[in-house]
Amino acid sequence: MKLKLVIDSDSDDYRLFKTTISTVAQLRKTAVLRFTTDRLIVVSTPKTAASGAILSGDQGQLWCTIPRDIFTLYNVASIREQNAIAMECQCDSLVNVLRRYERCNHGPLTIKLQSTPEWNQVHTGIQQGEENKPMGNPICALSCAFTEHLGYEDSGKEVSHVFKVGVRLLYKSQDARIVEPMVNYTKLLMFQLPPVNGEYGSKFTSFVKRLDRYATLNHLMIYGDRNSDRSDEGRLRLLVQELDWKLDVQWRGPLEMIVQDDQPSAVPASEPGLVGNVRHLNAGTSMQIEDSEMDIEATDIGNVSTSRPSTSVSPQEQTSQVFIKAKDWKVCSKLYDSFEEVVLAISHDESCVLHCSLDRGTVDEHSTKSKERGQIIYYMARSKPL
């Protein structure tokens, strides 16, 4: 298998790459990087196997999509379908390399997958003559190389830096188990959240973070419905119904609803054909790496009102509600603060999805066609039934 990427820090596309990796690093220590012919997919979930190499579970999954054309060179080759290469990576290590790269007088950053045989041997005994035996998943390195200019670029010296980030390659069977969650579209409401830098951004941030102060809170209900006065606007509420106290936090500002096109009953939240097809990577087992030289009083907070709920609202034709873990909602507040375009989708009594888009402008200055956007999607399964 071969992997070589080149990206320039002077381009806006580098910001997409850095933002995605940094966002994952803030939420999780590890992530799976899945390189395919068309894009890089970053997957992270809080549940890991004892080996640290296999991700499983369906709560709090973070799926990020980075199009291949953000790189000036994108060379990925393997014997698996779509040339897939999957590996587990320590996010902090990769972010530290990017920070070091940004402090230099910029040239391109080259990332290559390199074999590291010395990292794959472990001495299993102390008896003389006993051979070293390889570990389970092959451990390799993402070699990150760039040049730093000292002094003036014309007359100064150049220093080459190479940093190696350890990664653990995933076998075909392990990669196949990492499947994007499905969203049930039969009863789904979607809301375009106010931009964080817009008129209502600061007030909506207060709404999202209203429950962060309650450290012992386990579950909360996300309740959404259509505004009876205006069909193109929705309403959003956060309800707490614990044993000893109840709370109802309502968003009183504008909230745009997104009208669904005809959708299958259950599909991934990412665009059809974008991320959904990558879960069928079931071919190839080779791990050979080639050189890649190729009870609370009612209060008001801005447009947020909090009060005791009177009674629970039964599901209606235009309502969706679901219980999720309070910790998952705290992750949503972090993601909302980081992106301009955010969509919240509520699948009744099944799941909640936060979809963040990263705009990349148009193909060129004379074109109106937009480039493929980067995506960060946070899937939250219900924590308990209604």
From Swiss-Prot:
Name by which UniProt lists this protein: DNA damage checkpoint control protein MEC3
Coiled-coil parts of chain: none
Species: Eremothecium gossypii (strain ATCC 10895 / CBS 109.51 / FGSC 9923 / NRRL Y-1056)
Family: Belongs to the MEC3 family.
Quaternary structure and interacting proteins, as annotated: Component of the checkpoint clamp complex composed of DDC1, MEC3 and RAD17.
One Gene Ontology term from the biological process aspect of the record: telomere maintenance
InterPro entries: Hus1/Mec3
Free-text function comment from the UniProt entry: Component of the checkpoint clamp complex involved in the surveillance mechanism that allows the DNA repair pathways to act to restore the integrity of the DNA prior to DNA synthesis or separation of the replicated chromosomes.
Compartment(s) of residence: Nucleus
Keywords: Cell cycle, DNA damage, DNA repair, DNA-binding, Nucleus
Molecular function terms from GO: DNA binding
GO CC, one annotated term: site of double-strand break
